[in-house]
Amino acid sequence: MAVKKYRPYTPSRRQMTTADFSGLTKKRPEKALTVPLPKTGGRNNHGRITSRFIGGGHKRLYRIIDFKRRDKANVPAKVAAIEYDPNRSARIALLHYVDGEKRYILAPEGLTVGQTVNAGPEAEPKLGNALPLRFVPVGAVVHAVELVPGKGAQLARSAGTSIQVQGKERDYVILRLPSGELRRIHSECYATIGTVGNAEHKNIVLGKAGRSRWLGRKPHQRGSAMNPVDHPHGGGEGRTGAGRVPVSPWGQPAKGLKTRKKRKISDRFIITRRGGK
Protein backbone atom coordinates (compact mmCIF):
# COMPACT_ATOMS: atom_id res chain seq x y z
CA MET A 1 0.00 0.00 0.00
CA ALA A 2 1.23 3.48 -0.87
CA VAL A 3 0.29 6.78 0.74
CA LYS A 4 -1.48 9.27 -1.52
CA LYS A 5 -0.73 13.01 -1.21
CA TYR A 6 -2.80 15.97 -2.43
CA ARG A 7 -2.16 19.37 -3.95
CA PRO A 8 -2.72 22.11 -1.33
CA TYR A 9 -5.81 23.73 -2.87
CA THR A 10 -7.20 24.18 0.68
CA PRO A 11 -5.25 24.52 3.96
CA SER A 12 -6.41 21.09 5.17
CA ARG A 13 -5.35 19.41 1.92
CA ARG A 14 -1.77 20.64 2.36
CA GLN A 15 -0.89 17.99 4.97
CA MET A 16 -3.60 15.40 4.28
CA THR A 17 -2.61 11.92 3.15
CA THR A 18 -4.73 8.84 2.46
CA ALA A 19 -4.19 5.20 1.60
CA ASP A 20 -4.38 4.53 -2.12
CA PHE A 21 -6.12 1.14 -1.56
CA SER A 22 -4.16 -0.31 -4.48
CA GLY A 23 -3.74 -3.71 -2.82
CA LEU A 24 -7.47 -4.35 -2.44
CA THR A 25 -9.14 -6.83 -4.76
CA LYS A 26 -12.78 -6.68 -3.60
CA LYS A 27 -14.99 -3.72 -2.69
CA ARG A 28 -18.05 -5.25 -1.02
CA PRO A 29 -17.69 -7.45 2.08
CA GLU A 30 -18.98 -11.02 2.24
CA LYS A 31 -22.55 -10.53 3.48
CA ALA A 32 -22.66 -13.75 5.52
CA LEU A 33 -19.54 -12.63 7.43
CA THR A 34 -20.88 -9.23 8.53
CA VAL A 35 -23.11 -8.18 11.42
CA PRO A 36 -24.58 -4.76 12.38
CA LEU A 37 -22.44 -2.53 14.58
CA PRO A 38 -24.74 -0.14 16.49
CA LYS A 39 -23.36 3.18 17.73
CA THR A 40 -23.15 3.77 21.50
CA GLY A 41 -21.90 7.35 21.59
CA GLY A 42 -19.67 6.23 24.46
CA ARG A 43 -22.73 5.55 26.66
CA ASN A 44 -23.56 2.46 28.72
CA ASN A 45 -26.94 0.78 29.23
CA HIS A 46 -27.96 3.58 31.66
CA GLY A 47 -27.26 6.25 29.04
CA ARG A 48 -24.28 7.62 30.98
CA ILE A 49 -21.00 8.47 29.26
CA THR A 50 -18.37 5.87 30.16
CA SER A 51 -15.93 6.65 27.32
CA ARG A 52 -15.54 10.35 26.61
CA PHE A 53 -15.05 11.93 23.18
CA ILE A 54 -16.85 9.21 21.20
CA GLY A 55 -19.78 9.91 18.89
CA GLY A 56 -20.91 10.22 15.29
CA GLY A 57 -18.81 8.78 12.51
CA HIS A 58 -19.65 6.84 9.39
CA LYS A 59 -21.94 3.83 9.68
CA ARG A 60 -20.07 0.51 9.71
CA LEU A 61 -20.65 -3.21 9.36
CA TYR A 62 -18.56 -5.44 11.61
CA ARG A 63 -16.57 -8.10 9.74
CA ILE A 64 -16.38 -11.38 11.67
CA ILE A 65 -12.67 -12.27 11.85
CA ASP A 66 -11.46 -15.78 12.67
CA PHE A 67 -8.90 -15.19 15.45
CA LYS A 68 -8.75 -18.86 16.49
CA ARG A 69 -8.38 -21.05 13.36
CA ARG A 70 -8.08 -24.18 15.53
CA ASP A 71 -11.21 -25.86 14.20
CA LYS A 72 -9.83 -25.63 10.64
CA ALA A 73 -6.71 -27.69 11.32
CA ASN A 74 -5.44 -29.44 8.18
CA VAL A 75 -8.20 -27.89 6.03
CA PRO A 76 -6.45 -25.89 3.26
CA ALA A 77 -7.89 -22.56 2.18
CA LYS A 78 -7.29 -20.39 -0.86
CA VAL A 79 -7.02 -16.59 -0.52
CA ALA A 80 -9.97 -15.27 -2.52
CA ALA A 81 -9.63 -11.53 -1.83
CA ILE A 82 -7.84 -8.82 0.15
CA GLU A 83 -10.40 -6.38 1.58
CA TYR A 84 -10.67 -3.11 3.50
CA ASP A 85 -12.00 -3.26 7.07
CA PRO A 86 -13.20 0.04 8.61
CA ASN A 87 -13.01 -1.44 12.12
CA ARG A 88 -9.22 -1.94 12.20
CA SER A 89 -5.99 -0.59 10.72
CA ALA A 90 -5.04 -3.91 9.09
CA ARG A 91 -6.45 -5.31 5.85
CA ILE A 92 -8.37 -8.59 5.93
CA ALA A 93 -8.15 -11.65 3.68
CA LEU A 94 -11.16 -13.69 2.58
CA LEU A 95 -10.42 -17.42 2.66
CA HIS A 96 -12.31 -20.10 0.72
CA TYR A 97 -11.80 -23.46 2.46
CA VAL A 98 -11.90 -26.69 0.48
CA ASP A 99 -14.92 -27.80 2.55
CA GLY A 100 -16.89 -24.82 1.20
CA GLU A 101 -16.73 -22.51 4.22
CA LYS A 102 -15.62 -18.87 3.95
CA ARG A 103 -13.82 -16.92 6.68
CA TYR A 104 -11.89 -13.71 7.20
CA ILE A 105 -8.39 -13.52 8.72
CA LEU A 106 -5.97 -10.62 9.19
CA ALA A 107 -3.99 -10.16 5.97
CA PRO A 108 -0.22 -10.50 6.58
CA GLU A 109 2.29 -8.50 4.53
CA GLY A 110 2.97 -10.29 1.24
CA LEU A 111 -0.18 -12.45 1.16
CA THR A 112 -1.72 -12.43 -2.33
CA VAL A 113 -4.87 -13.73 -3.97
CA GLY A 114 -4.54 -17.35 -5.03
CA GLN A 115 -2.14 -18.41 -2.29
CA THR A 116 -3.02 -21.40 -0.11
CA VAL A 117 -2.88 -21.18 3.69
CA ASN A 118 -3.33 -23.82 6.35
CA ALA A 119 -3.62 -24.19 10.12
CA GLY A 120 -2.86 -26.77 12.77
CA PRO A 121 0.17 -28.51 14.31
CA GLU A 122 1.08 -30.11 10.98
CA ALA A 123 1.04 -26.82 9.02
CA GLU A 124 4.37 -25.56 7.66
CA PRO A 125 5.75 -22.38 9.27
CA LYS A 126 5.19 -20.23 6.18
CA LEU A 127 3.36 -16.96 5.50
CA GLY A 128 -0.29 -16.94 6.58
CA ASN A 129 -0.26 -20.35 8.28
CA ALA A 130 -1.45 -20.61 11.90
CA LEU A 131 0.17 -23.14 14.21
CA PRO A 132 1.07 -23.67 17.89
CA LEU A 133 4.09 -21.67 19.04
CA ARG A 134 6.05 -24.83 19.88
CA PHE A 135 6.25 -25.60 16.14
CA VAL A 136 7.40 -22.08 15.17
CA PRO A 137 11.20 -21.88 14.67
CA VAL A 138 13.26 -19.53 16.86
CA GLY A 139 13.82 -16.19 15.13
CA ALA A 140 10.57 -16.38 13.14
CA VAL A 141 8.25 -13.37 13.00
CA VAL A 142 4.59 -13.96 13.90
CA HIS A 143 1.39 -12.00 14.52
CA ALA A 144 -2.14 -12.65 15.87
CA VAL A 145 -0.76 -14.46 18.92
CA GLU A 146 -2.93 -16.00 21.63
CA LEU A 147 -2.30 -15.24 25.32
CA VAL A 148 -4.39 -18.20 26.50
CA PRO A 149 -4.64 -21.42 24.44
CA GLY A 150 -7.96 -21.50 22.60
CA LYS A 151 -9.02 -17.96 23.54
CA GLY A 152 -8.17 -16.42 20.18
CA ALA A 153 -5.49 -13.98 19.04
CA GLN A 154 -4.92 -10.96 21.27
CA LEU A 155 -1.38 -9.76 20.49
CA ALA A 156 0.03 -8.05 17.35
CA ARG A 157 -3.19 -7.44 15.44
CA SER A 158 -2.63 -3.82 14.30
CA ALA A 159 -1.23 -2.82 10.91
CA GLY A 160 2.53 -3.34 10.60
CA THR A 161 2.99 -5.11 13.95
CA SER A 162 4.85 -8.35 14.57
CA ILE A 163 6.31 -10.48 17.36
CA GLN A 164 9.63 -12.33 17.23
CA VAL A 165 10.19 -15.78 18.73
CA GLN A 166 13.29 -15.45 20.94
CA GLY A 167 13.58 -18.90 22.50
CA LYS A 168 11.86 -21.91 24.05
CA GLU A 169 11.87 -23.35 27.58
CA ARG A 170 9.78 -26.33 28.73
CA ASP A 171 6.09 -25.55 28.08
CA TYR A 172 6.68 -21.89 27.19
CA VAL A 173 8.00 -19.85 24.28
CA ILE A 174 9.78 -16.51 24.84
CA LEU A 175 8.49 -13.72 22.62
CA ARG A 176 9.62 -10.14 22.02
CA LEU A 177 6.48 -8.01 21.79
CA PRO A 178 6.19 -4.77 19.72
CA SER A 179 6.63 -2.75 22.94
CA GLY A 180 10.01 -4.40 23.57
CA GLU A 181 8.67 -6.55 26.39
CA LEU A 182 10.06 -10.08 26.69
CA ARG A 183 7.32 -12.46 27.75
CA ARG A 184 6.66 -16.18 28.15
CA ILE A 185 3.61 -17.51 26.30
CA HIS A 186 2.37 -21.10 26.55
CA SER A 187 3.64 -23.21 23.67
CA GLU A 188 0.12 -24.43 22.81
CA CYS A 189 -1.00 -20.88 21.96
CA TYR A 190 -1.55 -20.34 18.24
CA ALA A 191 0.25 -17.70 16.17
CA THR A 192 0.18 -16.79 12.48
CA ILE A 193 3.43 -16.55 10.52
CA GLY A 194 4.37 -13.13 9.13
CA THR A 195 3.86 -9.43 9.84
CA VAL A 196 0.46 -7.75 9.74
CA GLY A 197 0.07 -5.90 6.43
CA ASN A 198 -0.73 -2.25 5.65
CA ALA A 199 2.38 -1.02 7.50
CA GLU A 200 2.07 2.43 5.86
CA HIS A 201 -1.03 3.11 7.96
CA LYS A 202 1.07 4.93 10.57
CA ASN A 203 2.10 7.54 7.95
CA ILE A 204 -1.46 8.68 7.21
CA VAL A 205 -2.17 12.29 8.26
CA LEU A 206 -5.83 13.18 8.81
CA GLY A 207 -5.24 16.82 7.81
CA LYS A 208 -8.45 18.29 9.21
CA ALA A 209 -10.77 18.00 12.21
CA GLY A 210 -13.71 16.80 10.13
CA ARG A 211 -11.89 13.68 9.06
CA SER A 212 -11.44 12.75 12.72
CA ARG A 213 -15.21 13.18 13.17
CA TRP A 214 -15.83 10.76 10.29
CA LEU A 215 -13.96 8.19 12.39
CA GLY A 216 -16.29 8.77 15.34
CA ARG A 217 -13.86 10.84 17.42
CA LYS A 218 -15.12 14.00 19.11
CA PRO A 219 -12.89 16.91 20.20
CA HIS A 220 -10.83 16.23 23.34
CA GLN A 221 -11.65 19.07 25.73
CA ARG A 222 -8.88 20.41 27.99
CA GLY A 223 -9.52 20.40 31.72
CA SER A 224 -8.14 23.95 32.04
CA ALA A 225 -10.90 25.17 29.70
CA MET A 226 -13.63 23.81 32.01
CA ASN A 227 -15.26 25.11 35.18
CA PRO A 228 -14.08 23.94 38.63
CA VAL A 229 -17.21 21.79 38.97
CA ASP A 230 -16.23 19.82 35.87
CA HIS A 231 -12.48 19.30 36.31
CA PRO A 232 -9.75 19.80 38.94
CA HIS A 233 -7.88 22.06 36.46
CA GLY A 234 -10.93 24.25 35.79
CA GLY A 235 -11.70 27.82 36.78
CA GLY A 236 -9.59 30.94 37.25
CA GLU A 237 -9.58 34.29 35.47
CA GLY A 238 -8.10 33.97 32.00
CA ARG A 239 -5.57 31.26 31.37
CA THR A 240 -4.31 29.84 34.64
CA GLY A 241 -2.24 26.84 35.56
CA ALA A 242 -3.64 23.73 37.17
CA GLY A 243 -2.06 24.69 40.50
CA ARG A 244 -1.28 21.06 41.22
CA VAL A 245 0.12 17.91 39.65
CA PRO A 246 -1.78 17.31 36.36
CA VAL A 247 -4.68 14.95 37.05
CA SER A 248 -7.61 13.27 35.31
CA PRO A 249 -11.18 14.57 35.80
CA TRP A 250 -11.41 12.15 38.75
CA GLY A 251 -8.22 13.32 40.46
CA GLN A 252 -5.83 10.54 39.41
CA PRO A 253 -2.31 11.80 38.51
CA ALA A 254 -2.03 11.86 34.73
CA LYS A 255 1.73 11.97 34.15
CA GLY A 256 3.53 8.70 34.71
CA LEU A 257 1.54 7.12 37.54
CA LYS A 258 1.93 3.33 37.55
CA THR A 259 -1.55 1.83 37.24
CA ARG A 260 -0.63 -1.85 36.88
CA LYS A 261 -1.82 -3.92 39.83
CA LYS A 262 1.00 -5.08 42.14
CA ARG A 263 1.59 -8.82 42.37
CA LYS A 264 -0.53 -9.38 39.27
CA ILE A 265 -0.65 -13.09 38.46
CA SER A 266 0.78 -12.60 34.96
CA ASP A 267 3.95 -10.90 36.32
CA ARG A 268 5.59 -14.33 36.47
CA PHE A 269 5.46 -14.55 32.66
CA ILE A 270 7.14 -11.17 32.03
CA ILE A 271 10.93 -11.47 31.76
CA THR A 272 11.70 -7.86 30.78
CA ARG A 273 9.21 -5.01 30.90
CA ARG A 274 8.87 -2.62 27.96
CA GLY A 275 11.67 -0.08 27.90
CA GLY A 276 14.13 -2.71 29.08
CA LYS A 277 13.20 -2.43 32.77
Curated annotation (Swiss-Prot):
Name the keywords, alphabetized.
Ribonucleoprotein, Ribosomal protein, RNA-binding, rRNA-binding
For whether the record's keyword set contains rRNA-binding, the answer is yes
Residue segments, region Disordered: 215-263
Please give the biological process terms from Gene Ontology that the record holds.
Answer: cytoplasmic translation
**Keyword Nucleotide-binding set for record:** no
- The source's domain of life comes to Bacteria
Which Pfam family name is an example for this entry?
Ribosomal_L2
GO terms for cellular component? large ribosomal subunit
Cite the GO molecular-function annotations of the record. Answer: rRNA binding; structural constituent of ribosome; transferase activity
InterPro entries (UniProt xref): NA-bd_OB-fold, Rib_uL2_dom2, Ribosomal_uL2, Ribosomal_uL2_bac/org-type, Ribosomal_uL2_C, Ribosomal_uL2_CS, Ribosomal_uL2_dom3, Ribosomal_uL2_RNA-bd_dom
What does the protein in this record do? One of the primary rRNA binding proteins. Required for association of the 30S and 50S subunits to form the 70S ribosome, for tRNA binding and peptide bond formation. It has been suggested to have peptidyltransferase activity; this is somewhat controversial. Makes several contacts with the 16S rRNA in the 70S ribosome.
**HAMAP family in the cross-refs:** Ribosomal_uL2_B
| Family of this protein | Belongs to the universal ribosomal protein uL2 family.
Q: How does it assemble?
A: Part of the 50S ribosomal subunit. Forms a bridge to the 30S subunit in the 70S ribosome.
Q: What is this protein called?
A: Large ribosomal subunit protein uL2
